[in-house]
């Protein structure tokens, strides 16, 4: 029996060695027999997108954006790296799918019947409507009926082209438009505010973000109803990628991650106020340059631009501001709070900013550790505005009403209830002006978006002006000038020192295509 056992062992080992030796010659060895297997064998998920404030951009060299963040998490879910290719317009995105250069398109693309004939849609995650925009002060059309190709231009591959054709066939036979093959929707909106173009069409979310920096852009009319936004992948008999996407989004929905990401990028609201935004941006030009050094000096755990947005919400950057309730100064501190922080003069801008930051940091340190890092600031700001105890009540109420107390998206919805007796009467700390705290945080977020985008727009303009100057005044030798070389760098520094940042633009478009490895 012992000998027989040894023979079987020998045969087994021999068979195993033979199988290993022959394995590479088997026809299906190494072949990725489905799309997910191919992605995992390659070790990277190839995603094509476009530069917009919402989908994909960079600040301080770091990529961010709703679609980028979701794509990065999906790549992690698959256990591979993310490779991002940035294209100029929507047509180029679908070319990537057609040519096998992308696994997915993640670019805020609208689901529609024409696209799904040729491409596989994924789960939908938010919705937009298509809107016609014009420049404030120019003629506002009330209908599409009389628009011509000389007035209306849209981006290539834009989903609205199908809607325009339907409207032309059924309602407005005189309607015509032009497609600019070289520009995306953001660039066309820039052309509108610069007076180069009368009208263009973009989605409602893109317009809302653009208006934070360019309040002179206005909506003339809606072209479509709300349309779901989705990702697209190749359409064939292989459904493994679609199944993985469905599982991924279901998991994100169940654990609240999707809601948190959407709150981060879409939670600023759409109640755009032209006058308020214009007033704020004028203050950025006129007042901020004097205060910027103080914001940069005392902002520690937060971005100085967020601190500036907080101060504007508090006092409109007025160091002498006083409210009927007795709060005073740049950061509108109460007398008791100022005394506890060692502030001797609340109307001294530096003391007020320094004290306000320390008070905010104290609120930040009290926010429960279970709150995600990138949402802690919003809980702290709510506490800064209405008191830490009432913020705890808001969290408790969120739990009682089956929400997530660690999700700002859930908690902020309950804030207005703190001033309603059926709710505050059952809470530990009673009545609070929760609706004011809600508006307070939302306004700060809007001012921050406007400030970041506007300063970076200034950087773009300064760079373009410098490049134009270099073209207009080409380099010559000191001998030819009879003096020192033209102080080009000095000019750039002086003309833009109040605005230059070390980050690429948030709200202006990029040309060409780029690839990023993450």
From Swiss-Prot:
Annotated catalysed reactions: Exolytic cleavage of the (1->4)-beta-glycosidic linkage between N-acetylmuramic acid (MurNAc) and N-acetylglucosamine (GlcNAc) residues in peptidoglycan, from either the reducing or the non-reducing ends of the peptidoglycan chains, with concomitant formation of a 1,6-anhydrobond in the MurNAc residue
Residue ranges of the region described as LT domain: 270-518
Topology within the bilayer: Peripheral membrane protein
Enzyme class per UniProt: lyase
Keyword tags: Cell outer membrane, Cell wall biogenesis/degradation, Lyase, Membrane, Signal
Predominant subcellular localization, coarse grouping: membrane
GO cellular component, one term: cell outer membrane
InterPro entries given in the database record: Lysozyme-like_dom_sf, MltF, Solute-binding_3/MltF_N, Transglyc_AS, Transglycosylase_SLT_dom_1
Active site (record annotation): 314
Matching PROSITE patterns: TRANSGLYCOSYLASE (PS00922)
GO-annotated biological processes: cell wall macromolecule catabolic process; cell wall organization; peptidoglycan catabolic process
Pfam family, one: SLT
Listed NCBIfam families: PRK10859.1 (NF008112)
Free-text comment about domains: The N-terminal domain does not have lytic activity and probably modulates enzymatic activity. The C-terminal domain is the catalytic active domain.
Similarity comment text for this entry: In the N-terminal section; belongs to the bacterial solute-binding protein 3 family. In the C-terminal section; belongs to the transglycosylase Slt family.
Record protein name field: Membrane-bound lytic murein transglycosylase F
Organism in which the protein naturally occurs: Escherichia coli O6:H1 (strain CFT073 / ATCC 700928 / UPEC)
Lineage, opening ranks: Bacteria, Pseudomonadati, Pseudomonadota, Gammaproteobacteria, Enterobacterales
